[in-house]
Swiss-Prot record:
Keywords: Allergen, Disulfide bond, Hydroxylation, IgE-binding protein, Protease inhibitor, Seed storage protein, Serine protease inhibitor, Signal, Storage protein
Extra facts: Resistant to proteolysis.
Region (Disordered): 54-98
Family that this chain belongs to: Belongs to the 2S seed storage albumins family.
Annotated S-S bridges: C33-C116, C45-C103, C104-C152, C118-C160
Function, as annotated: Weak inhibitor of trypsin.
PANTHER family: 2S SEED STORAGE PROTEIN 1-RELATED
Keyword hit for Repeat: no
Protein name: Conglutin-7
Sequence ranges of Basic and acidic residues compositional bias: 77-98
Induction profile: Repressed by water stress.
Amino acid sequence: MAKLTILVALALFLLAAHASARQQWELQGDRRCQSQLERANLRPCEQHLMQKIQRDEDSYGRDPYSPSQDPYSPSQDPDRRDPYSPSPYDRRGAGSSQHQERCCNELNEFENNQRCMCEALQQIMENQSDRLQGRQQEQQFKRELRNLPQQCGLRAPQRCDLEVESGGRDRY
């Protein structure tokens, strides 16, 4: 009976020690993640996604035969265009691909921590939620945001709640 008591006491001690160590490990992970998020520059991700949404709206929301869309029209004259805007002939937009590359470099820092990757995606959503116009644009932004890790060749978080303007959450 004494041996059984000692074994039970030892088992409880080991269980408590394991729980304490796990809690300490998770706390360190939270601090590490918070530090990574503070150092990360997620602005290129936000810019890439907003440009992508804008391009999609431009290509789906307008008449392709409209004179304002004609790359040969005077309004599209290269001498009159803003030199920093993407070329009308470049369907992807050079600025966006630069933003995507910089974004992927930043997201790569979170690849080994799926929870932290999710928090980075949540931060991007929160930063841009005020700029999104209407439910349709918000949903499109979320779709693009969910696909962002895969576009960068990274694993996407298995479960991640994305904050929505109404205060609820969308889970994917």
